[in-house]
Amino acid sequence: MEDFVRQCFNPMIVELAEKAMKEYGEDPKIETNKFAAICTHLEVCFMYSDFHFIDERSESIIVESGDPNALLKHRFEIIEGRDRTMAWTVVNSICNTTGVEKPKFLPDLYDYKENRFIEIGVTRREVHIYYLEKANKIKSEKTHIHIFSFTGEEMATKADYTLDEESRARIKTRLFTIRQEMASRGLWDSFVNPREAKRQLKKDLKSLEPCAGLPTKVSHRTSPALKTLEPMWMDSNRTAALRASFLKCQKK
C-alpha cells in the first residue's frame, strides 16, 4: 500500500499526509491504510477548491486558466493540510473577519460565497452512515458537511452540494480511479477492512527476523513542491491552475 500511495499521489500530497501523521505520532510505513486515506482526503479537498473563484460582483465563477485569474478571489480557503497551530490561526482570522461562529473542531475548507465552513468526508462505507457519524461529532448546524464515497455516491447537508455537477463528477471519477488502481494491485479489500489488514500486519511483523547491516538513513529533504505550496496558501492571489498542476496522478 505504501508503494501505491507514493506512485499514485503527488509528492506534495504525500509529504503533507506524512507530516499530519507524524504530528499525531503515527507512522505512515506501518499504518499504510490510514496513509492512503489521508492522501485521498487531501486530494479531494484540493479538487473541491480548484478553479472556483468569486468575481467583483461576489458571484461564483469557474475559470481554469492561470494569469487572468490573479485578481479574482478564491472561493474556498483550504484549512486541511496545515499544521494545527496554523490551521486554527486561519480559522480564527476567518471568524474575526466574517463574524461566523467558531467551530469546535477544525474544518477542511471555508466557503467565502456561502460564508460557511465545510467538512469533507471520504468513506469506504455507506455515505449516510458516515454522514451521521460526522454530524454527531460536529454537532453544529453552522458547519456544512459533504460526503463522497468510492462508489460515486455523495451526501450533503440539506442536499446542498455546493459545487456544480461537473466539479463533483471530477472528484467522483478520481475516487473511482483510486479504487480501481487499488483493486488491480490487490489492495482494495484490506483498505475496506482495516481490522483484517492490522491482523495481517501483526502476523507479518512477527514472522520477520531482525536484519543487521541494513541501511537505516532516512531522507528528510522537503520537496520543492511543498516549499512552493506553503507560501502560496498564505497568498490570497495564488492561482488554482498552479495548485491543480500538483494533483495529477503519477503512474509508472
From Swiss-Prot:
GO terms for biological process: viral RNA genome replication; viral translational frameshifting. Keywords: Decay of host mRNAs by virus, Eukaryotic host gene expression shutoff by virus, Host cytoplasm, Host gene expression shutoff by virus, Host mRNA suppression by virus, Host nucleus, Host-virus interaction. It comes from the Viruses. The active site is at residues 80, 108. The record marks 195, 198-199 as: Important for efficient shutoff activity and nuclear localization. Its main location: host cell. GO terms for molecular function: RNA binding. It is found in: Host cytoplasm; Host nucleus. Signal peptide: none annotated. Belongs to the influenza viruses PA-X family. The probable endonuclease active site in the N-terminus and the basic amino acid cluster in the C-terminus are important for the shutoff activity. The C-terminus acts as a nuclear localization signal. The C-terminus is recruited to host protein complexes involved in nuclear Pol II RNA processing. This is Protein PA-X. It comes from Influenza A virus (strain A/Duck/Hong Kong/2986.1/2000 H5N1 genotype C). The gene is PA.
